[in-house]
């Protein structure tokens, strides 16, 4: 289908959806539709930080370390507020919103490390959006066809 325009909202509140299966809310960095919504706090809070981060947070009193020390130790492994990488990550979500319309409803790719990969971990997000922000062969072809 031909995409002449689409509507996109950047949200500064956490955006969540309720999962009927596990009966809990999940932060969603992007909800595609009309309009598509990209939530900056959900980019930061949604995808999980490394397991070691949570492990140390649980044991910080036992280990005699502060939350700030743990944050500093793991800073390169997750996106935080005022993070210079946040713009690149948000751009990746804009690309996903565009592909939602180009594919008639499928903004994600199951092939890691495509930029459209649905990252559930911060480290995946950083790799696919900052360190290696490229589309897989299939999505590059789809993009080329859309431009014709």
Predicted regions: what they are:
Residues 1-28, 78:
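N-terminal low-structure segments adjacent to metalloprotease catalytic domains
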Residues 26-85, 102-148:
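Metalloprotease/metallohydrolase-associated module, dominated by Zn2+-dependent proteases
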Residues 82-100:
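ATP/nucleotide-binding catalytic cores
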């Amino acid at each position: 289908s031909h995409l002449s325009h689409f509507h996109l909202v950047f949200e500064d509140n956490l955006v969540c959806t309720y999962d009927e299966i596990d009966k809990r809310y999940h932060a969603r960095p992007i909800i595609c539709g009309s309009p598509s919504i990209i939530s900056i706090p959900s980019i930061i809070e949604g995808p999980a930080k490394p397991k070691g981060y949570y492990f140390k947070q649980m044991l910080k009193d036992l280990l005699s370390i502060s939350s700030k020390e743990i944050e500093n130790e793991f800073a390169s492994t997750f996106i935080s507020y005022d993070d210079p990488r946040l713009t690149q990550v948000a751009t990746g979500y804009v690309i996903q919103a565009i592909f939602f319309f180009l594919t008639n409803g499928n903004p994600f790719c199951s092939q890691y490390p495509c930029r459209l990969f649905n990252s559930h971990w911060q480290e995946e997000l950083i790799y696919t959006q900052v360190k290696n922000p490229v589309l897989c062969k299939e999505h590059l072809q789809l993009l080329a066809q859309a431009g014709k």
